[in-house]
Amino acid sequence: MIIKFGRKVLQWLNFADEDIQLARHALTLSTAVPYRLVAYHAQQCAEKSLKAYLVRHRIDFPYTHNISRLLEICSKPAQWDNPMWDAEELTVYAVTTRYPGEDEEVSRDEALRAIALAELVRKTVQLKLNEDR
């Protein structure tokens, strides 16, 4: 797989996989689950998956956590189905979940939706990468 995708692409994908695994694992904690961190790691999975796609296609991208922006940049070589654009919802979790502030806590339902969206992005990126081989 390294030969097919390249080392950098695999590094981005591995980091994305670690983020989603951590998000899923947090849901199994017997103590109070930090849903904001579940949502944060889901956002990170989606972001890193999209960046892996851009690295694979040798497309420069800005330093950003904005999923909408990354989807737009990725749309040059790939056409995404409409459900992928729902992942724009994840952008808010990139910063607001990491620092104290006025924002409301993330609910279990919101955390589960964040995981589902991140998994959709990760799976779709993997399918697109496989098509490119």
What is each model feature region?
Residues 1-133:
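Terminal alpha-helical segments
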